[in-house]
Design a protein with these regions (language model features):
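Regulatory extensions appended to serine/threonine kinase catalytic cores
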Residues: 183-195
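Protein kinase catalytic-loop region centered on the HRD/HxD motif
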Residues: 26-38
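Catalytic-loop of the protein kinase fold
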Residues: 38-45, 50
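AlphaC helix of the protein kinase catalytic domain
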Residues: 3-14
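C-terminal lobe helix-coil module of Hanks-type protein kinase domains
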Residues: 83-186
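Activation segment signature within eukaryotic-like protein kinase domains
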Residues: 22-23
Length: 195
């Protein structure tokens, strides 16, 4: 198998169908952890393994420690992780199930748009954006995408913890609800890879 980062490098953008499938399997995997009171804290494409049949396995469970501001500023190593960190994680070192959902939302945004919503040339600026700016609506990057998909991503990536679903089980249920309302065109939507 390969990790999702490898697939992203190969494909650049994904269809709504592929994105929601991978997001769904990731949420499903996280749901068991959240029920057991475990938060992952470091959800990013590098930690999402796709087996030979393309199914998701989440790696690095429990290895990820909350990232302190000091480590963020002192090393560029964390730039990758910084792109997916939830605001409360950055500000208060607070690891929550909703923080995992935020990371999943950023990952989904990136799969659909072919780029992360916030970019910066250093981790400090990047985390500052996550704390002080709202994640742009996915429709800004993917015009014509289904409004329900956009709303679901907006909920996952809400800046305030309480505006996100409570945990991965709740998010998974919301996703299933959303999927039952998608048309064939909605499923097939894919942003043409921009060079």
């Amino acid at each position: 198998g390969v990790n999702l980062r490898y697939e992203m490098n190969q494909q650049v953008t994904f269809s709504v169908r592929e994105t929601l499938r991978i997001v769904g399997e990731t949420l499903d995997g996280l749901a068991s952890a959240h029920r057991a009171g475990v938060v992952h804290r470091d959800i990013k494409p590098e930690n999402i393994l796709l087996n030979d049949r393309g199914h998701v396995q989440i790696t690095d469970f429990g290895l990820a420690k909350a990232v302190s501001q000091a480590t963020l500023s002192s090393t560029g190593m964390l730039l990758g992780t910084a792109a997916y960190l939830a605001p409360e994680m950055i500000q208060h070192n607070q690891a929550t199930p909703q923080g995992d959902l935020y990371s999943v939302g950023i990952m989904a945004w990136e799969m659909l748009a072919g780029k992360v919503p916030f970019t910066a040339d250093n981790p400090v600026t990047l985390v500052f954006k996550h704390v002080h700016e709202d994640v742009p609506d996915i429709t800004t990057a993917c015009p014509g995408i289904n409004a329900g998909v956009a709303a679901f991503l907006a909920r996952l990536t809400a800046r305030a913890v309480e505006d996100r679903p409570q945990d991965a089980s709740v998010a998974f249920d919301e996703l299933q609800q959303l999927q039952s309302n998608l048309t064939i065109d909605d499923w097939q939507y894919r942003l043409s890879a921009v060079s």
